[in-house]
């Protein structure tokens, strides 16, 4: 097959695409149920477990951060799962089979991770830093590794599905609605978690905490699994254009992982955007590992109240996601909108530190709301830019690459946040200064992201991508 053949095939497939129905608003919101479930699960892992392990079980923040971040470090599997969903259908579908099976595994694994967490706490309390404690820490880490693999298997094909079922004229609407639903999930998760944990006070007995957390990790994952099925059933069969857009969709015996990596490396802009996303996500989410402990230690919030902080920032993010695509990006453009988001995020970090020094809870909550707005602006602009840098020919592959950058950065941000907090405690021996160091480092990273963004060129990517893919496939598929 020559590059000329590939181009000819694409032209022939244009008429086929006309036969697919357009997504309506109801379907877009239905797709959002899947993302809503992911948002709810994120509250359980970073909004609840980190608080319990650090504050209630007295596990060092560095160990907690490393353990919780392990699921993010399974991100290289995203490229593999993306490539697999491009080339090897599962349960008869390119995307849906991976999404459903992955959802079953990550919801079930979350509950087993909690049980391993209790064993770590019990062993540490009874035996100290013994072989038994290290064993259970290893088991806990293994649970999060499985969780990360299952999450990658499910979420990467879902993101690729969004490319498959949308066109240029409605893709921004799909992204805006679906990612807004992600924030709705975070808000729902925060409020629901707070309600289910309302009887758990600051000095509640560990047995009470354990029963409440176990119930939480039974009820919420079950709901998330239902959301995953409701949000995606029948979508791929009715709306996916992948088979008509891609010449490799049915050539699973010939398209290898090596071919996939060559496609990714063929364009200079791929590496530049990967680096930008990596630094941006680290800086944006470094505070995740320390925010709830910060609220508990500096403002003396119980678990039920600190968990609700996700709702405060989540509402801001939801507003940012829902309005940026209509009010900001059309006027400023994607790159300038990203720069504004980075600056606003830095300001929010400064205000969070000021609130701690002054002890003003109202300033803290206002800063969190501003952080949410800035995160919504940044996310909308970054996702729109990401779709401009995704070739429909190999959507799963490129989505996997961007997912790799995002997930690895999220994992590393958790580690950096926890380690920086511990380093700050040793350097200053004052909790407020230690937490302030984390937020300061995050702000510096946001400014660095602006400089990296200036090197990203969408037009260069688009000019080179089609030719590079056709050339590589010509050599690999013949």
What are these regions (language model features)?
Residues 100-133, 343-359:
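C-terminal ends and interior cores of transmembrane alpha-helices
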Residues 76-92, 320-336, 421:
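Helix-to-loop junctions at the C-terminal end of transmembrane segments
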Residues 61-62, 137, 168-177, 303-304, ...:
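Loop-to-transmembrane helix entry/capping segments in MFS-fold secondary transporters
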Residues 338-381:
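C-terminal transmembrane helical hairpin of 12-TM major facilitator-type secondary transporters
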Residues 87-105, 329-343, 430:
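Cytoplasmic membrane-interface "Motif A"-like loop-to-helix N-cap segments
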Residues 47-63, 289-306:
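Short amphipathic helix-loop junctions that connect adjacent transmembrane helices
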Residues 1-26, 130-145, 149, 153-159, ...:
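Intracellular loop-helix junctions on the cytosolic face of multi-pass helical membrane proteins
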């Amino acid at each position: 097959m020559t590059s000329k053949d590939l181009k000819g095939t694409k032209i022939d497939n244009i008429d086929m695409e006309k036969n697919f129905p357009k997504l309506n608003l109801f379907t877009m919101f239905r797709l959002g149920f899947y993302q809503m479930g992911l948002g709810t699960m994120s509250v359980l892992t970073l909004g609840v477990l980190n608080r319990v392990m650090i504050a209630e079980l007295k596990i060092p923040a560095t160990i907690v951060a490393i353990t919780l971040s392990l699921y993010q470090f399974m991100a290289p599997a995203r490229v593999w799962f993306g490539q697999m969903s491009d080339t090897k259908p599962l349960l008869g579908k390119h995307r849906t089979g991976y999404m459903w099976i992955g959802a079953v595994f990550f919801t079930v694994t979350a509950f087993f991770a909690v049980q391993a967490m209790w064993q770590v706490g019990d062993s540490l309390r009874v035996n100290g830093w013994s072989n038994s404690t290290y064993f259970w820490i290893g088991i806990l880490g293994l649970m999060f590794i499985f969780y990360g693999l299952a999450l990658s298997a499910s979420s990467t094909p879902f993101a690729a599905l969004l490319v498959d079922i949308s066109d240029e004229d409605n893709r921004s609407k799909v992204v805006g609605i679906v990612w807004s639903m992600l924030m709705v999930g975070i808000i729902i998760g925060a409020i629901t978690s707070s309600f289910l944990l309302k009887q758990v006070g600051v000095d509640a007995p560990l047995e009470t905490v354990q029963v409440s957390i176990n119930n939480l990790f039974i009820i919420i994952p079950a709901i998330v699994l239902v959301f995953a099925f409701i949000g995606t059933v029948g979508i791929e069969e009715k709306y996916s254009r992948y088979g008509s857009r891609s010449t490799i969709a049915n050539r699973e015996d010939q398209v290898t992982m090596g071919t996939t990596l060559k496609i990714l490396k063929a364009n200079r802009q791929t590496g530049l955007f990967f680096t930008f996303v990596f630094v941006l996500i680290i800086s944006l989410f470094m505070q995740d590992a320390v925010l709830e402990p910060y609220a508990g230690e500096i403002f003396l919030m119980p678990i039920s109240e600190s968990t609700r902080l996700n709702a405060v920032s989540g509402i801001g993010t939801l507003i940012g996601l829902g309005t940026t695509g209509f009010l900001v990006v059309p006027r400023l453009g994607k790159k300038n909108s990203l720069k504004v988001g980075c600056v606003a995020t830095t300001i929010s970090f400064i205000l969070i530190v000021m609130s701690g020094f002054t002890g003003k809870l109202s300033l803290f909550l206002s800063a969190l709301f501003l952080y949410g707005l800035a995160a919504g602006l940044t996310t909308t602009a970054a996702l729109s830019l990401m779709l401009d840098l995704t070739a429909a020919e190999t959507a799963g592959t490129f989505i996997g690459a961007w997912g790799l950058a995002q997930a690895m950065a999220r994992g590393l941000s958790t580690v950096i946040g926890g380690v920086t907090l511990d380093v700050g405690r040793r350097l200053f021996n004052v909790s407020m200064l230690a937490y302030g160091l984390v937020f300061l480092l995050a702000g510096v990273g946001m400014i660095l992201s602006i400089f990296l963004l200036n090197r990203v060129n969408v037009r260069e990517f688009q000019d080179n991508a089609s030719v590079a893919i056709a050339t590589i496939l010509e050599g690999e598929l013949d």
